[in-house]
Amino acid sequence: MKKYIFMRVLRSLVSIFLVTTLTYTIIYTLVPRKLIFKQDPNYNKIATTADKRDNYENTVFERMGYIEYYDTKELQEKASSMDSSVTVEANATNKAIYEKYINQLGHGWTLGEFTESGQFYATREIPIFERVFHFYANLIDIDHTNKIQDPENPDLKRYLRFENDPAIGWSLVGSGTKHKYLLYFNSQFPFVHQNFVNLNLGDSYPTYANTPVLQVITQGQGQTKTAQVQFPTGKKTSSVNIYSRTYKSPSQADSREVASYGKDDPYTATESNYQYPSMIVSSAITGLIGLVLAYALAVPLGSAMARFKNTWIDSLSTGALTFLLALPTIALVYIVRLIGSSIALPDSFPILGAGDWRSYVLPAVILGLLGAPGTAIWIRRYMIDLQSQDFVRFARAKGLSEKEISNKHIFKNAMVPLVSGIPAAIIGVIGGATLTETVFAFPGMGKMLIDSVKASNNSMVVGLVFIFTCISIFSRLLGDIWMTIIDPRIKLTEKGGK
């Protein structure tokens, strides 16, 4: 079994690599890069002249990993190492120096001129294979005591130690690390939290500009929520998430931060607490409710269809389930939405918001109706197949009733293959339901994927595809392992378990 799991994990990693790499390559080579400025609110404000526009575009392209870029000042500083007489002025002498410097650089660097001022800049197009390499090279972000290198704070202490922190109690506290708290405990699930290892999926742009992708989908939503927060210097009413403290150069700290954290503590950068759940949690809420509804409908219905096969119950149920399976998802979504709105349920999430349970009802019902038909038909199939098995004949010979045989013997064995899909279904709810969330304007990960595609938020699209792929692939492995726990007769081996 160990060898089987090892090989499955290895194949899973290869699959994740192939899917993510293909997605990354398609997005960063086939999608016109200037589309990213369509929903950038700062673009028209900053790019008031041709020079400012070109500089802003190149700066963003560099941040997004398309190019390397030296603006006029940077180029002059770089070229001065070769010829100290070079200036930023637009003249033939400087141009000749810059051209010579660019030729020395090689590797695809080109010299450009701003339209209005005529001043010079340099760019290098980063090849797609190099971009992909950088994505994977920076994917795993490990925090350590030499993470922060701040020239303005050369005497920064460097350590890792357990201490009774005045703000959060016992925790593993770091200095010289990016995060203040590397390991801590609180009442929020999963109760034990760490900041040693984090995923770096890039920064979001243009929506949620310059915010890490993982932070966008895991932080709360809505307005900030204030509460009594225990700071190192005492309790204050604030929206600060005290557990999120990261390093900030002391020269950049304002008086409020110094008053809250103390003069000698440089870990003053924090995230905020919000009123409503994050995208992951929001998708999980409706997904789990929908999953429970799906199994609550499918299990008794499928069992009844198998027990009373070839009767009117079986025929009627089969017809209804076939209709639901044939009905386009978009049609089912709008039918349920119409019915729900007629009984005073909100047909759009923002109407009542995350604070009202009614906002979750229709999306959860739709997910339940989408999942129930297929599950019910599989239960019927498995149970009918088992009705002709020897152990069923033996049970009948012992005089057991059909109800006892169905409930105690057939049903139990029929659940084994279905159990393998439960971990995938449970974990899969994190990914959300793209169509349902979009129609209801539901703030989950499914809707975020569609919104990111529309906004050409390439980093977010790649990040979500990576997360969805990991969830999909590893949940299948968990399903196989769970099946062996339910039925010890099943063995996972390389020979028979591929």
Curated annotation (Swiss-Prot):
<feature type="transmembrane region" description="Helical">
    <location>
        <begin position="12"/>
        <end position="32"/>
    </location>
</feature>
<comment type="function">
    <text>Part of the binding-protein-dependent transport system for oligopeptides; probably responsible for the translocation of the substrate across the membrane.</text>
</comment>
<dbReference type="Pfam" id="PF00528">
    <property type="entry name" value="BPD_transp_1"/>
</dbReference>
<dbReference type="GO" id="GO:0015833">
    <property type="term" value="P:peptide transport"/>
</dbReference>
<feature type="domain" description="ABC transmembrane type-1">
    <location>
        <begin position="280"/>
        <end position="479"/>
    </location>
</feature>
<feature type="transmembrane region" description="Helical">
    <location>
        <begin position="316"/>
        <end position="336"/>
    </location>
</feature>
<dbReference type="GO" id="GO:0015031">
    <property type="term" value="P:protein transport"/>
</dbReference>
<keyword id="KW-1003">Cell membrane</keyword>
<keyword id="KW-0813">Transport</keyword>
<keyword id="KW-0571">Peptide transport</keyword>
<protein>
    <recommendedName>
        <fullName>Oligopeptide transport system permease protein AmiC</fullName>
    </recommendedName>
</protein>
<feature type="transmembrane region" description="Helical">
    <location>
        <begin position="279"/>
        <end position="299"/>
    </location>
</feature>
<keyword id="KW-0653">Protein transport</keyword>
<dbReference type="GO" id="GO:0005886">
    <property type="term" value="C:plasma membrane"/>
</dbReference>
<comment type="similarity">
    <text>Belongs to the binding-protein-dependent transport system permease family. OppBC subfamily.</text>
</comment>
<feature type="transmembrane region" description="Helical">
    <location>
        <begin position="359"/>
        <end position="379"/>
    </location>
</feature>
<keyword id="KW-0472">Membrane</keyword>
<keyword id="KW-1133">Transmembrane helix</keyword>
<feature type="transmembrane region" description="Helical">
    <location>
        <begin position="461"/>
        <end position="481"/>
    </location>
</feature>
<feature type="transmembrane region" description="Helical">
    <location>
        <begin position="415"/>
        <end position="435"/>
    </location>
</feature>
<dbReference type="InterPro" id="IPR000515">
    <property type="entry name" value="MetI-like"/>
</dbReference>
<dbReference type="InterPro" id="IPR035906">
    <property type="entry name" value="MetI-like_sf"/>
</dbReference>
<dbReference type="GO" id="GO:0055085">
    <property type="term" value="P:transmembrane transport"/>
</dbReference>
<keyword id="KW-0812">Transmembrane</keyword>
